Amino acid sequence: MIEGISAVTLGTHEKPRAVRFYRALGFEVLHGGEESSFTSFRARTSYLNLIAQPVERRSSWGRVIFYVADVDALYDRALTAGYHPAAAPRDAEWGERFFHLIDPDGHELSFARPSLSVSARYQLEATCHSMSRWERV
């Protein structure tokens, strides 16, 4: 059974700029840095990795979604650091507050916070799923 995601690794064509970008948003460097070919940032119990890529190697589109303590505070931090999110934070119909930001290599990042109702719903679904497994035993 899959238990979770340990890490996401993104390619970068300009490593120093990419490392500065993530540091400015508050990511903690665990290994590597601007001059390393591989850098790992801690994201609580998971990791975001950057790996240097040759210019001719292009990546396809993708999105990484990070849950954060305060969506609006991180949005303000991004603006203060000189970055320009696509739009201001908003409340989504699926129960999250979020905003998107494109990193220096074109990767789309989403910074979100689930609402209590969504968190409660997921906990209830997990409990019900566990109970149904007990009934089958």
Regions found by a protein language model. Give the residues of each.
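Conserved beta-strand in the GNAT
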Residues: L48-I51, H100, L109-A112
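N-terminal beta-strand motif that seeds the catalytic metal site of vicinal oxygen chelate
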Residues: M1-V19, G62-V64, A112-W134
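Vicinal oxygen chelate
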Residues: H13-P16, V64-E108
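Short, charged/polar surface micro-motifs in flexible loops or helix N-caps
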Residues: R44-L48, V55-R57, D70-D72
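Core segments of cupin and vicinal oxygen chelate
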Residues: I2-E3, T9-L48
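Active-site beta-strand termini and strand-to-loop segments that position acidic
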Residues: S40-T45, L101-P104, P114
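Short acidic/glycine-enriched loop/turn segments that link adjacent beta-strands
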Residues: E34-S37, R58, E93-R97
